[in-house]
Structures are given as structure tokens and as C-alpha cells.
């Protein structure tokens, strides 16, 4: 018989998979000899497209059974036969525990049958799931609910005489609206719909300006209260990467103000003039950070000049750019290629002044995401790594680095600088505007676009990697044992190993 005589709604839905041949519902299997308890049969390999789930036993469970086909099987003779798979699928499901004489269980990832009591000659095999499979299919929870309400479906109101058809109906065959069977109706939790986050890029700047202008007085009072609280130690601070997601215009501005107030814990108290100046510079989300006046002391070290920018000051906007004081002529961004003059100034700083090196970190009044990733939170000093130890690193603990050079670069051919800050930082950190994400570790070059870096790697370094891999593969083939395929570093080790096979 064909599969098309069933309604389409019964076998196309994933929860109502009644995908079986009609003959299987009206067949029964009887044994021709006595079978003791504990006898196993199988495996029942579900390789057919109509039998791709272990739920086929439950789908054949009904209160009324019509026997149109009777198969008499000798299980002992069928154990080693390839027909063991078809006749196991013909075994009908038991209606209750009293009728059950065989249970289905998993062994080695396959379905097996096992007798739970002595089966006499001519008796029909009736199977149901063991405790493990009943728990996996969710029958335990439905059974606990059925002890109080009886065998009546809470969805469609259909009543059953036996337990197993009721469980199969509630779990797979009920076509009504699905309700939580385990929990009563009056205790069911209402459905909570999640609101999708909508990022409004058009009104970020306008809403941020309006909100921060109205909440300037509130920020001032909160800042005064938090000045009296003890500051966190560097050990208790966590360096985390924060991502801005704007849900709506109102929630965007609210979250922005909360972020700004939260980052004030990391800043040190400054005078009122610096606070007012930083608030004015943060009114717009797309304004540049103003250049600070030249220091009065001409002999001040370049580390004191770069310290506020190494601390990564910015406003609360994700679109603002930082203008490093070491490169005054042009603006720097994480996606722009730095000029040679700015990079030369960053890599060749003047000797620092150790007396004033700690005072350079006091200018931290401006707030932003980059303030969390400031150099005072890392155990490695950023500016001190450019000169290979020539500059002092007062915040370095024990002289150890978290980001070792060999974890970020792979020296093939020429030797790279191991003390460069580009090899000591993760790809998400961009000191002095140098684009680490679009940086070639082999040539020490930075690219403005990621596509340029990809084109550079394919055109300049593809042959080198291919040649190296080919040489390594040939060497491994020569130093590999042809019998046990064990690899050796030296050829005389392989020669000594080959004597063991003789």
C-alpha cells in the first residue's frame, strides 16, 4: 500500500510523523518456541526513510488493535539472518505494562529489543520503551500528570483506556493547539515576546546631544558623590570589550549616559576647569577631540605628551576620532593608514623623564569605551615597548607580558621585532592609530582596507607559504615509517626504528 492514503497533515508535520506502511499497523509477531527472560534481539537499524526515528513504536500504539497479518518467527534462527531488521519493525506496541513482554533499549547507538519475562510458544511479542527511552521521549512528565487527571488529553479532550496510547497521543499525535501538559493551565506562564534590537544610526548624534545637555547637572552631582568613594585597584578592574547597540532613540541616549557615569569610576578627580572643558567637547558624537595646548616645559618627555592619548580618551560616541598629540598634522583612525612621519615619531621617542612619568596619567577626565582599555589596566606599558626597553614602564608587573610575540606573528624568512607594541597587543587594540587588524606581520605594513591586505597576502606571500608547506611535506614523507607511519625528526632515528620491524 502506498503512503498517500493518509491525510497529509498526519505525516508532513514533525510532531505528527505517522510515516509508516499501512501493513505494519495490522501485523503481529508470534514466536514458535519458548523464549526466556533477558533474551535480546537486534539491532533494529532504522535505515529506511519511513523509519528514521525510534518513535515508530509509540505511533503504532492504539486502544484497539486489528490483526490482519500474523508472522510466526523463530527468534533463535533469525538472530544471524539479514531479515532480523524487517521482522523487528513488525512487533506491535503494548497498550499497558500488563501486556508488555518486550522492551526497547539503546545499545551502541542502535535500537535493540529485550524480553522482560518468559514468553511462551505462540505468544505475541508486545514492546514498549525502557526507562531511559521513556525519559528521553518525555513520557515520564506526561505520566506524572496523568495520575491525577486520568487518561484524558488536556488539549483535545480525547479519553483513552490504556496508558501507552495516551502517552503516544499526547506526545506525537495530538493535532490541537499545544499547551504545557506538565504544568496546569492556571499556572502556565504567559508567552513573552522578545523585542528585536533596532539600531538607529540616523539620530544617534542628535539624540545624544539633546540628552547630554539636559542631564549635565545630574552628571555633575553624581561625579561629586563618586569622588568620595575609594577608587578601584588595577587588579579588581577587568579589561573588557564593550559593544554599542542602540535599541531605540530613547534607550540609546539613556544607555549612553549610563555608560558615561559608569566609566567615571575609572577616572581620577580633576579640577573644575578640566571637567567643564571635557563636557563641552562631548556634546556632539561626531566632533573631533580638541588639541591640548603645548606644554610649558619644553624638555618634557614624549611619554608625557602621549600619555593622555595612550590612555585612549574619547567621548561617549562610537564614531569619534582621537587626534594623537604626537602627530598633530592629521587625524588618526583605526581604519586609516598612518603616515611615515607619525609612525617614526611613535617608534623613536625621546628618553623619558622618570620623575614626571607617573604624573602624566592624571588627565583622564574624558569618558568613553577606549578608557576601559587604557594602558594603566594592562600589565605591559604600551609606550615603553616601542623602543625595546629604552623607556621606563612603571606599571609593568614583574616584566612579564600577557601577549607573547610568538602568539601573534610567525617568523618566516626575516626576523621581526619582538619588542614592538604591535606584537604585544591583541588585534582589537590600536595604539597611536596604527591599524592592527589590517597589518601584515611579515612585511610590517598597515593597510587601510581589509581587501588591500587580502590582495597583498595573496600576491606576495602565497608562493612562500606554498613552497614551505611543500618542503615540509616532502621532509615528513622521507622521515615517516612506511609500516607504522611514525614520524621521526632525524633520518638515523628512522633507520634505527626500521630494525624493529625486521
From Swiss-Prot:
Keywords: DNA-binding, Metal-binding, Methyltransferase, Neurogenesis, Nucleus, Repeat, Repressor, Transcription, Transcription regulation, Transferase, Zinc, Zinc-finger. InterPro entries: PRDM8-like_PR/SET (IPR044402), SET_dom (IPR001214), SET_dom_sf (IPR046341), TR-Histone_Methyltrans (IPR052296), Znf_C2H2_sf (IPR036236), Znf_C2H2_type (IPR013087). One of its GO terms (molecular function) is methyltransferase activity. Residues 8-130 form the SET domain. A zinc finger (C2H2-type) spans 151-174, 438-460, 479-501. Its EC number is 2.1.1.-. It holds the Pfam family PRDM2_PR. S-adenosyl-L-methionine binds at residue 129. One of its GO terms (biological process) is regulation of DNA-templated transcription. Residues 269-286 have a biased composition (Polar residues). It is an enzyme of class 2 (transferase). GO terms for cellular component: nucleus. Residues 267-303, 338-361 are annotated as: Disordered. It is found in: Nucleus. Expressed in pMN progenitors and oligodendrocyte lineage cells in the embryo with expression declining in oligodendrocytes undergoing differentiation. Transcriptional repressor. May have histone methyltransferase activity. Negatively regulates shh signaling activity in pMN progenitor cells which prevents their switch from motor neuron to oligodendrocyte precursor cell production. Independently of shh activity, also regulates oligodendrocyte formation. Belongs to the krueppel C2H2-type zinc-finger protein family. This is Zinc finger protein 488. It comes from Danio rerio. The lineage of its organism: Eukaryota, Metazoa, Chordata, Craniata, Vertebrata.
